């Protein structure tokens, strides 16, 4: 069994902290929360400290933040129904674009692998795809409305321009651009959860997806492409996603976030029972029937709900978490 070792506990935000995001280089991260501010933290020696506070971009809670793949831009999604784009072109971070269009709170934001596309989703049940049209210019490429409820999360595929979204309607949906007419379409609906799907994340090559839900389970989904050797039918030559594993019994309350480490293959969960749990694929796992085991759990990782967890993209086994308790914690997993 592994261990989750606490390395740092950080404070600075007022109120609950909703989101944390590692910079692609892994030596800086950003945090956001109820206080309408974004904090950018960096490591000096062995001490993490706030380097910058961005407090003039939003009028309400900031729900999520994400760095662009190049690390030059930061996008923030807010309950004020806008998404702000920040960059450091002049030496200091400033808000260079504000994306408007959603009718209600923006819940999530995600950059595509190339950084040329941005996705947002909202309580208004819609998913928007934006194209980067030039310096600080973004054009709406699609407004997608297949969900019947609040959309909680959007995440781009790590190697393709394929988008996944998770919703209060208990489903996950996949979107891709039709090559003929360049229209964005919903290409798959993933149904198995029995309550809100809070979080989703792809594995390193994007052939599998993990989801977490209010139903206290995590599920592993596998992509079956046209011509697959497993004999899974693919109507209309579209990739089919099947739930190949359900992990249940470890969480006592809603699971709010899940992160699939691209370096180690470990899965981390953030739970409403104040805990963080780490899962690993077993050595005898089969492609069409994978099995995962919990290798460690920190039951009282925070004093209140854990809202977000994210693996460091560079430092293997380093995990960051944030909570309603107003703290950010940095952990190290030892297997």
Curated annotation (Swiss-Prot):
SUPFAM superfamilies per UniProt: WD40 repeat-like (SSF50978)
InterPro entries documented for this protein: CIAO1/Cia1, G-protein_beta_WD-40_rep, WD40/YVTN_repeat-like_dom_sf, WD40_repeat_CS, WD40_repeat_dom_sf, WD40_rpt
The name this protein goes by in its record: Probable cytosolic iron-sulfur protein assembly protein Ciao1
Family of this protein: Belongs to the WD repeat CIA1 family.
Pfam families to which the protein is assigned, alphabetical: WD40
BP terms from Gene Ontology: iron-sulfur cluster assembly; protein maturation
First and last residues of every WD repeat: 12-51, 57-96, 101-140, 146-185, 192-231, 250-289, 301-335
Gene Ontology CC annotation, any one: metallochaperone complex
Purpose of the protein: Essential component of the cytosolic iron-sulfur (Fe/S) protein assembly machinery. Required for the maturation of extramitochondrial Fe/S proteins.
Record organism: Drosophila sechellia
Source organism superkingdom: Eukaryota
Keywords: Repeat, WD repeat
